[in-house]
């Protein structure tokens, strides 16, 4: 990898239940680029992980839940200065276990948010594009967003 052009692989998942998405309000870390934003759960790949491995680990770490039914919905390429991030975007509607609301306490606060209210929250502008695609139930999509 060219050190002048670093790449990052991440996952993000929106758990769905009763017309709501499980959202993480990122309020804990002060120097967090997502500070005060509402996002799904997920994170960075660890060494040797596949997108699915990362998804399952991150959801379990941040929620206490083990996913049983999930779907890769798209790949979002973020251009952030010299960094390129490839985010594998998932939704899930099946899991086992009980939600541990403070599992993500190092990241923020977990809340179930009605899908109709998500775009009124402080979210990234680009996220509004993929929220629309998720609501339209597009089978798969790819986006490129520059910040």
What are the roles of these predicted feature ranges?
Residues 133-147:
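Charged phosphate-binding loop/patch that engages nucleotide di/tri-phosphates or the phosphate backbone
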